Structures are given as structure tokens and as C-alpha cells.
Amino acid sequence: MPINRPNLNLHIPPLNIVAAYDGAEIPSTNKHLKNNFNSLHNQMRKMPLSHFKEALDVPDYSGMRQSGFFAMSQGFQLNNHGYDVFIHARRESPQSLGKFAGDKFHISVLRDMVPQAFQALSGLLFSEDSPVDKWKVTDMEKVVQQARVSLGAQFTLYIKPDQENSQYSASFLHKTRQFIECLESRLSENGVISGQCPESDVHPENWKYLSYRNELRSGRDGGEMQRQALREEPFYRLMTE
């Protein structure tokens, strides 16, 4: 399906992502997860499997690269322009109503398999059932071969609390966990080879492609102390335990 490219002179603002910084105050989102961890975890365990209806007629990787300043597909605004090495996708009508709390996933695949990986995941990424309102993928033609987002972390999924008070509901957490497990399975089923996981991220042994970082309380440089702190993040624990 060709990407819809309206003839509109629109300004699409960048993703509202808070940069990592030292000594960040723990936000209420994190406190809520910590204080209600056992209750949320127990609720999630009792919930049925989530089902994700895949979007049809979505652009392939080549089509994404040609999205230019503004395009639309399956309710997502797309843009790939200027010197930005990423192709951005943002749901026009967000499903999550809270403020970004720093939680995000990277997907790392072999450099030459990014188009194949995108083909495997596109129906899920554009799905109306997806819990991810904002995501991006590296434009491999714009990065040098040894760049961080060339060797791995080619996909980034930004997770926002679903509730207006910027707290995660158990149902949304469950849906998100099921979604990332589905992404993992889809890549494996399609024979995609994993890439280099960022030093800044953490992941359990059973994740071959995805990794996690909270960018309000960590930086890109990584280190064992940071990774240990990330492993203790309640959001990460709810995704993995």
C-alpha cells in the first residue's frame, strides 16, 4: 500500500523525550509501580493472552525511507527528513494519555537484516492493538557502518503510561509485556539474526532482540552499576518476572 502523503505544510514536532540526567527525581509513575508492584504483578498473571490484529497494507522499509517530511499510514504520522538518521512514527490519536516516564525498548538486529526485520514487525508496529504510540527505526543509508544505531538498537519503542495521571494500569502493562514477547517471537520465526545490544540497556536471557532502558535514570554510556539499577526498575521487573 502506498503511503498517503497529503499536500500539507505541517510542522511535526520531535518526540517529546526527556534527556537522561544525573540525580533525576523519581517520578510518581515509578513510585506507583514500586508501591503497587505485587498487586500489579498478581493482576497481570491472571489476565488472558492479548491478541494483536496485524495491520495490512503497511509500507515496507523502502517505503518508510521515502516518507519525507510528512506521510500517513494506518493512523501513524511518519517523517524522515533532514539530517535525522531515524524514521519516526507517531500515532495521530495517542492511546496512552500519561506523560512519558522514560521507559523504552530497543530492538537490535544484524545490520544487513534491518529491512527484513522491519518486514517481519511492521504489521504489529502499525497495529491498532499495539500499546506503542511512538517508535522509530534507523535509516541505514544515513549512518556509518560502525555507528551505535547501525550495529544494534535500530528500533526504539517509547512506552507511555496509559492513564491520564501518568500511572500504568495492570491491563496496559500486561498488554505491553505480551506485545514485546510477540515481537521477539516474530523476529525469531523469520530467521532474523540479533544485533549488538547497547551497553546502556538490560535484558533477560530469553530476550534475543529486545532490551530495556529508562532514560530518565540512566545514560548511554552504561556500566555495571547502571545496569544493576535498571534491573531493579519496577517497570522492567513487571516485563520480565
From Swiss-Prot:
This is MAPK phosphothreonine lyase. One of its GO terms (cellular component) is extracellular region. NCBIfam families: PRK15245.1 (NF011781). Secreted effector that irreversibly inactivates host MAP kinases by catalyzing the dephosphorylation of the phosphothreonine residue in the pT-X-pY motif present in MAPKs, via a beta-elimination reaction leading to a dehydrobutyrine residue. Its EC number is 4.2.3.-. Belongs to the phosphothreonine lyase family. GO terms for molecular function: lyase activity. It is an enzyme of class 4 (lyase). It is found in: Secreted. Disulfide bonds: none annotated. InterPro entries: OspF/SpvC, OspF/SpvC_sf. Pfam families: VRP3. The active site is at H106 (proton donor), K136 (proton acceptor). Keywords: Lyase, Plasmid, Secreted, Virulence.
